[in-house]
A protein has these predicted regions:
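ACP-dependent fatty acid/polyketide chain-elongation machinery
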Residues: 1-70, 250-262, 359-374, 416-426
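Condensing-enzyme catalytic core mediating Claisen C-C bond formation in acyl metabolism
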Residues: 5-9, 26, 32-37, 220-298, ...
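Active-site pocket-shaping loop/turn-to-helix segments
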Residues: 15-18, 65-86, 134-144, 162-177, ...
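Phosphate/pyrophosphate-binding loops at sites that engage ATP/ADP/AMP, CoA/4′-phosphopantetheine
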Residues: 88-103, 252-259, 290-307, 329-333
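Conserved beta-ketoacyl condensing-enzyme motif
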Residues: 8, 23, 29-166, 196-204, ...
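Acyl-CoA/ACP chain-elongation machinery
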Residues: 187-233, 268-281, 310-319, 335-389
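Active-site-proximal alpha-helical scaffold in enzymes
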Residues: 81-94, 145-148, 153-156, 162-196, ...
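Glycine-/small-residue-rich "gating" segment that lines the acyl/pantetheine channel
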Residues: 127-136, 177, 181, 185, ...
Length: 426
């Protein structure tokens, strides 16, 4: 049976606090926030009037869209995915040709509420105004869940599997898992994997109605997202995209590619909406099962983990997540790995979260640092009852990071975990 080793050779990102991987590195180190106040949310009487949204400049967009005739796109989720995906492809040292198809390469770009983002511009507003005939040919492509992958592939011309997954907040990590499995089986040489999430009142309003967003920081946006903090009252919605080029080790070595990390193992599962699991809450037994299975496949012991990239949204679920990590990893309390999340800077980017956070993880591994968990005034005591305070860095720590486990958990009782090891020629 074919069992290829799989590595990551390219990264790209569009985040609320940075455009591109180089800028994202700086933002992570300095704790730069991309969370802002939105007057539209205030005018609609949203309880949460802040969000993390990428600031795409026309110059930044023009470098990509003017060359590839995508400048008329209205859907932000698609725009973010195209920018992040193309950056990752170039970062991997790969090229594309207008008149050729690359059957050795494929793509998995997941999305969440992509239709709610684009449909506002492309469909709803024109239909309600009686302008159905003016919808144009982009209405459906910009609204369909596979729109991001389709528009990006229009440029790259990849001929292997082209897939768009949608699994709530695990979408990004799951896209990488799916690409990893495809490459392990020898069905492709390269897979561009990632996810994207759009923004705007339709997406934000739906979460606001659930009363799971923060409502105490409309006048202080940058301090609104506070994962693991005792005073946190909900998460801040975010948007953006992360993308990575996954490649078989054989392919990467044959072309002398830079390798960021190797994927050692991964797992995805469901709690079945049983035993405490629901549409909005996880089944802790399933979460622990997922974490353990990813480590088992990776053949990694818990004491080898240097960093946990957690889900940690800034809700009451943070303490439960820490308990689950503790149960899955076992070991002495003082041996618990460092743990962080970039959500204090960018908010919870929903379907885009896993991929953006994986890019953040790869940057930290490459540059040997751990970014801080910013905005914490006092750590939730239910968390410090489980792990030592010093395992939760509040500012950037410069440290060699060799092995990381990254996990996300999503509505519908879904879980996904991935184990990565920094590449050191071997």
């Amino acid at each position: 049976m074919i069992n290829n080793r799989v590595v990551i050779t390219g990264i790209g990102v569009v985040a609320p606090n940075a455009l591109g991987a180089a800028d994202f590195e700086v933002a992570l180190k300095e704790g730069r926030s991309g969370i802002r106040f939105f007057e539209t949310s205030q005018s609609l009487n949203f309880r949460c009037q802040i969000a993390g949204k990428p600031l795409i400049t026309e110059d930044y967009k023009a470098r990509f869209f003017d060359d590839y005739y995508q400048n008329k796109l209205d859907n932000n989720a698609i725009i973010y995915a195209c920018l992040a995906g193309f950056e990752a492809w170039e970062n991997a040292g790969l090229t594309h040709h207008q008149d050729q198809i690359d059957f050795d390469s494929g793509m998995i770009i997941g999305s969440g509420a992509l239709g709610l983002d684009g449909s506002n511009h492309a469909v709803f507003s024109k239909i309600l105004a009686g302008n159905n005939k003016r919808l144009g040919s982009r209405a459906i492509p910009e609204s369909m869940s596979s729109g991001a992958a389709a528009y990006l592939n229009k440029i790259l011309g990849l001929g292997n599997r082209i897939l768009s997954n949608s699994s709530a907040c695990i979408t990004g990590t799951e896209s990488v898992l799916l690409g990893y499995e495809h490459l392990k089986l020898g069905k492709a040489k390269r897979m561009l994997c990632g996810s994207t999430e759009g923004d705007g009142i339709f997406i934000w309003g739906a979460f606001d109605a659930m009363r799971i967003l923060t409502s105490d920081s409309n006048e202080d946006p940058t301090n609104g997202s506070r994962p693991m903090c005792n005073s946190s009252v909900g998460f801040v919605p975010g948007s953006g995209s992360g993308a990575m080029v996954l490649e078989t080790l054989e392919s990467a070595k044959s072309r002398g590619a830079k390798i960021y990390a190797e994927i050692l193992g991964a797992d995805v599962n469901s709690g079945g909406l049983r035993d405490g699991g629901s549409m909005t809450a996880p089944n802790s037994n399933a979460v622990v099962h997922c974490m353990k299975n990813s480590l088992r496949e990776a053949k990694v012991n818990s004491d080898e983990i240097d960093l946990i990239s957690g889900h940690l949204t800034g809700t009451k679920g943070d303490a439960t997540e820490i308990k689950n990590w503790k149960k899955a990893l076992g070991g002495a309390q003082d041996k618990f790995p460092l743990i962080n999340t970039p959500k204090s800077m960018i908010g919870h980017c929903i379907a885009g979260a896993g991929s953006i956070e994986l890019v953040a993880t790869l940057i930290q591994m490459e540059k040997s640092f751990v970014h801080g968990n910013y905005n914490i005034k006092e750590v939730n005591p239910d968390i410090t009852a489980e792990i030592p305070l010093e395992r939760i860095p509040m500012k950037t720590v410069h440290k060699e990071i060799n092995t990381v486990i990254k996990a996300n958990f999503g509505f519908g009782d879904l879980n996904c975990a991935i184990v990565l090891r920094k590449w050191k020629d071997g």
